[in-house]
């Protein structure tokens, strides 16, 4: 962790706590807050362009609506994968052009198609006959992208059960595009959500996308866009990139050689997760005379939870463990192997008994009310998942560390040439 991140946390805690006095504690001084190191985004962009230089990242906006994150990616040269009109409007409100957006949701309300037509969002995904006919009726000039089924069957949360055309349906859908005199811009797939580790799922997706291209050419269509989806994380990206490069070279050899292939991807977590750290405050401490089952006797209750920034604990059973404790403005690292630790459990602020962040956490035994716990990798699917359950709201105040190398990473976004 960069020293500047640690200092940002310490300084903010000292500031908010300096405003309190006995009997007069401001609610704002107890609100959880983020520190975001925007330099991390620039480093990730450079790593992406080194590993997959011919693939343009279209950031999956659903993972984070943070405007500074989005603006930094836009400056680097990213496009944007939007799954709703609201996400499209967010991107456009930041002065980012419509040509940098792909509407990736395969099943959309009719009203959104009319708005996309009005706003100039041309690249739109479908995966079934009903959706294609809906597009034909409401937005016939759209540049359609056929999403095919490509999933990792070992994944705990497979997406293929919800979206993606089966191989048996590809031929009929391609022929229907031709029959309706519409444009098939290309093919896409989404191998798995961000817990994916099976790079072979991406290879299967690329091969199925190549089948879409082949069948399209047989009926006189000329697709040029390959969208290899999302699911990339720090731990899986290099493995996936190493499998994707040769698969594209093998399956799309002539298009690559002739410069007739535009390749997109939809990374979300890869860019949004690690730049953000979250500090939450301990609001209560309880020690039971007898442990409940195998749980530790000590329980800590925090001012956040699964209905706020820890929703991924509920969705995919993700484990969260603090990397530091801040006490009276001083940072205490919790990752050092030599430090003394005590078992405890971390509980969220709601009245739901399932609102537990970690049932077996090892922390400084002195942690108590008023201390802050710092968590890393908190940028993806956190603020976007906040609810108002129990009446709680989240301020989600964020302190930004400005990027210093963005000019070196900056590239001019190359507009997709989608004319068929």
UniProtKB/Swiss-Prot annotation:
Pfam families: Orn_Arg_deC_N, Orn_DAP_Arg_deC
Active-site residues, Swiss-Prot/TrEMBL: 351 (proton donor)
Modified residues (S-nitrosocysteine): 351
Site positions per UniProt: Stacks against the aromatic ring of pyridoxal phosphate and stabilizes reaction intermediates: 190
CDD domains noted in UniProt: PLPDE_III_ODC
Gene Ontology terms describing biological process: alkaloid metabolic process; putrescine biosynthetic process from arginine, via ornithine
Induction (UniProt): Expression is induced in loline alkaloid-producing cultures as well as in planta.
Biotechnology remark: Loline alkaloids show broad-spectrum anti-insect activity, and different lolines may have different biological activities. In vitro tests of NFL, NAL, NML, and semisynthetic loline derivatives with long carbon-chain acylations on the 1-amine have shown that many are effective against both fall armyworm larvae and European corn borer larvae, but the effects seem to differ depending on the modifications. N-Formylloline reduces the weight gain of fall armyworms by deterring feeding, and does not significantly affect corn borers.
GO cellular-component term (any): cytoplasm
Cofactors demanded by this protein: pyridoxal 5'-phosphate
A GO MF term: ornithine decarboxylase activity
Top-rank lineage group of the source organism: Eukaryota
EC annotation from Swiss-Prot or TrEMBL: 4.1.1.-
Sequence positions that bind pyridoxal 5'-phosphate: 194, 231, 266-269, 381
Pathway: Alkaloid biosynthesis
Keywords, in A-Z order: Alkaloid metabolism, Decarboxylase, Lyase, Pyridoxal phosphate, S-nitrosylation
Gene3D superfamilies to which the protein is assigned, alphabetical: Alanine racemase, Lyase, Ornithine Decarboxylase, Chain A, domain 1
Binding site residues for substrate: 315-316, 352
N6-(pyridoxal phosphate)lysine: residues bearing it: 62
Role description: Amino acid decarboxylase; part of the gene cluster that mediates the biosynthesis of loline alkaloids, potent insecticidal agents composed of a pyrrolizidine ring system and an uncommon ether bridge linking carbons 2 and 7. Lolines are structurally differentiated by the various modifications of the L-amino group and include norloline, loline, N-methylloline, N-acetylloline, N-acetylnorloline, and N-formylloline.
Subunit structure of this chain's protein: Homodimer.
Family, as annotated: Belongs to the Orn/Lys/Arg decarboxylase class-II family.
Protein name: Amino acid decarboxylase lolD1
């Amino acid at each position: 962790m960069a020293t500047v991140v640690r200092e940002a946390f310490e300084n903010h805690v000292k500031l908010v706590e300096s405003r309190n006095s006995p009997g007069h504690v401001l609610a704002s001084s107890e609100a959880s807050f983020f520190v975001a190191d925007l330099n991390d985004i620039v480093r990730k962009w450079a790593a992406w362009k080194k590993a997959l230089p011919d693939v343009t990242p279209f950031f999956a906006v659903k993972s984070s609506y943070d405007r500074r994150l989005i603006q930094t990616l836009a400056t680097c040269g990213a496009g944007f994968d939007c799954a709703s009109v609201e996400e499209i409007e967010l991107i456009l409100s930041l002065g980012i052009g419509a040509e940098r957006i792909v509407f990736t949701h395969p099943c959309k309300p009719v009203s959104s198609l009319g708005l996309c037509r009005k706003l100039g969002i041309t690249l739109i995904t479908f995966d079934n006959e009903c959706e294609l006919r809906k597009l034909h009726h409401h937005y016939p000039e759209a540049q359609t992208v056929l999403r095919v089924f490509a999933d990792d069957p070992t994944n705990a949360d497979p997406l293929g059960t919800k979206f993606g055309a089966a191989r048996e349906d590809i031929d009929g859908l391609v022929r229907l595009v031709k029959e309706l005199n519409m444009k098939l811009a290309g093919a896409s797939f989404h191998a798995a959500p961000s817990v994916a580790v099976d790079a072979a799922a991406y290879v299967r997706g690329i091969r199925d996308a190549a089948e879409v291209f082949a069948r399209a050419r047989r009926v006189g269509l000329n697709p040029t866009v390959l969208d290899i989806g999302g699911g990339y994380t720090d731990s899986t990206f290099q493995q996936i990139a190493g499998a994707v490069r040769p698969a594209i070279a093998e399956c799309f050899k002539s298009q690559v050689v002739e410069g007739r292939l535009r390749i997109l991807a939809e990374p979300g977590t890869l860019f949004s997760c690690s730049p953000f750290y979250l500090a939450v405050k301990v609001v209560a401490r309880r020690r039971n005379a007898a442990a409940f089952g195998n749980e530790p006797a000590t329980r800590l209750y925090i001012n956040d939870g699964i209905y706020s920034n820890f929703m991924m604990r509920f969705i995919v059973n993700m484990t969260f463990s603090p990397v530091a404790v801040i006490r009276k403005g001083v940072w205490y690292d919790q990752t050092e192997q030599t430090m003394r630790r005590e078992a405890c459990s971390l509980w969220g602020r709601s009245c739901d008994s399932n609102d537990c962040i970690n049932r077996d956490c090892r922390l400084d035994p002195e942690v108590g009310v008023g201390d802050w716990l710092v968590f890393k990798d908190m940028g993806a699917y956190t603020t976007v998942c906040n609810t108002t359950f129990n009446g709680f709201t989240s301020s989600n105040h964020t302190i930004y560390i400005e990027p210093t190398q963005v000019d070196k990473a900056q590239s001019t976004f190359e507009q997709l040439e989608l004319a068929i």
